[in-house]
UniProtKB/Swiss-Prot annotation:
UniProtKB keywords: DNA recombination, DNA-binding, Transposable element, Transposition
Functional note: Involved in the transposition of the insertion sequence IS2.
Gene Ontology BP terms: DNA integration; DNA recombination; transposition
UniProt keyword annotation of rRNA processing present: no
Record has DNA-binding as a keyword: yes
Name recorded for this polypeptide: Transposase InsD for insertion element IS2A
Segments forming domain Integrase catalytic: 106-289
GO MF term set: DNA binding
InterPro entries assigned to the protein according to its UniProt record, in alphabetical order: HTH-like_dom, Integrase_cat-core, RNaseH-like_sf, RNaseH_sf, Transpos_IS3
Length: 301
């Protein structure tokens, strides 16, 4: 704009300058009519971020692995409970960046040569459940193995079991039964629910598959060497290890199991999930039930 003003001052026409420099002719006319003592009255709005910063510190003090999006989701939820205006996610990002509170960027992961074109998530609850297992080590060297079941729509951890033994059919059957009781009480599903798992022996055992069909579940196995086909369960393992197991006290197996129960409860009640509009699984379910909406419409709110 300064170059345009200089050219016009030398005698060049306003239309020619605006066309050649691709600047607004109307804006040039406004600038040329300004007096010498003109001052820009616009000022950037000053915001006091002290209170927001304190709340951010409170969140990351308890959950140090949370990035700015999940911090924003928890602040938004608290603001809704208090009847206050929600905080913008960009403001949370700016404050955390200015105070060096952002997480380090993840290293770039080379894309897989094996494309996965299927979709694990479903549009309604109780259409497909997925299951998997993981293990972790306590400070005293004791190893715990966890088996769990998730809903592939609302991401709620339906049931889980922990043991010092291996992954076996009996544990999987306990998780199946607990998941059905969680969603249907003493009844069985009116239509079969897909039970998506990998090809572990505890899932492919005849006893497991027969028990699943007795409960109204339809066993489905992923393709061989295709962990992406059970991506929701794989992502949950990464989440539970990063956000909970890595920071919780686990001096021995008993203490770790008690803290793991609190971790699963916190995940269901508080953990913001990007696929749910950064709502927790149970928060999403309550919102859907309160509004009487389907899963698709609920995600749009």
């Amino acid at each position: 704009m300064d170059s345009a003003r200089a050219l016009i001052a030398r005698g060049w026409g306003v239309s020619l300058v605006s066309r050649c420099l691709r600047v607004s002719r109307a804006q040039l006319h406004v600038i040329l009519r300004r007096t010498d003592d003109w001052m820009d009255g616009r000022r950037s709005r000053h915001t006091d971020d002290t209170d927001v910063l304190l709340r951010i510190h409170h969140v990351i003090g308890e959950l140090p692995t949370y990035g700015y999006r999940r911090v924003w989701a928890l602040l938004r939820r608290q603001a809704e409970l208090d009847g206050m205006p929600a905080i913008n996610a960009k403001r949370v990002y700016r404050i955390m960046r200015q105070n060096a509170l952002l997480l380090e960027r993840k290293p770039a992961v080379p894309p897989s040569k094996r494309a996965h074109t299927g979709r694990v998530a479903v549009k309604e609850s109780n259409q497909r459940w997925c299951s998997d297992g993981f293990e972790f080590c306590c400070d005293n060297g004791e190893r715990l193995r966890v088996t769990f079941a998730l809903d592939c729509c609302d991401r709620e951890a339906l049931h889980w079991a922990v043991t010092t033994g291996g992954f076996n059919s009996e544990t999987v059957q306990d998780v199946m039964l607990g998941a059905v009781e969680r969603r249907f009480g003493n009844d069985l599903p009116s239509s079969p629910v897909e039970w998506l798992t990998d090809n572990g022996s505890c899932y492919r055992a005849n006893e497991t598959r027969q028990f699943a069909r007795m409960l109204g579940l339809e066993p489905k196995n992923t393709a061989v060497r295709s962990p992406e086909s059970n991506g929701i369960a794989e992502s949950f393992v990464k989440t539970i290890k990063r956000d909970y197991i890595s920071i919780m006290p686990k001096p021995d197996g008993l203490t770790a199991a008690k803290n793991l129960a609190e971790a699963f409860e916190h995940y269901n009640e508080w953990h913001p999930h990007s696929a749910l509009g950064y709502r927790s699984p149970r928060e999403y379910l309550r919102q859907r039930a309160c509004n009487g909406l389907s899963d698709n419409r609920c995600l749009e709110i």
